[in-house]
Amino acid sequence: MRMPALLIAALLPLLALAADETPLPATVDSLQIIELTEGTGTEARPGNTVVVHYTGWLYDPQAEEGKGKKFDSSVDRGSPFDFPLGAGRVIRGWDAGVAGMKAGGKRRLIIPPDMGYGQRGAGRVIPPGATLLVDVELLDVR
């Protein structure tokens, strides 16, 4: 009788961890920001030029971590991307999702269509109405 009780006691923490995993939403109607690594450097604010590494996927709630088809990656090219934060030079999801990050930080952004490429999409790479998932690492703030 003692052995089953010990086995159950050992399995309870594992069951709690499994139950704690929140499923990804099927649709996203607002920007989702997931802090992966808190940076310790300068905070990015509108007006700064930010230097980032990123990888972008089409959001797919059925795929592992929501990562559907990869559409672009500065990491794969080995070439960081810089842009003036808040100047409208990138999609709104990027401006809003990078603001407040600190250099050295990493975030996962789940960007709804209205903060991405909307109903027009982007060429043959991003279809109309696509939700995007982008991992961003803030390398520098100038």
What are these regions (language model features)?
Residues 2-142:
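Cross-family detector of peptidyl-prolyl cis-trans isomerase
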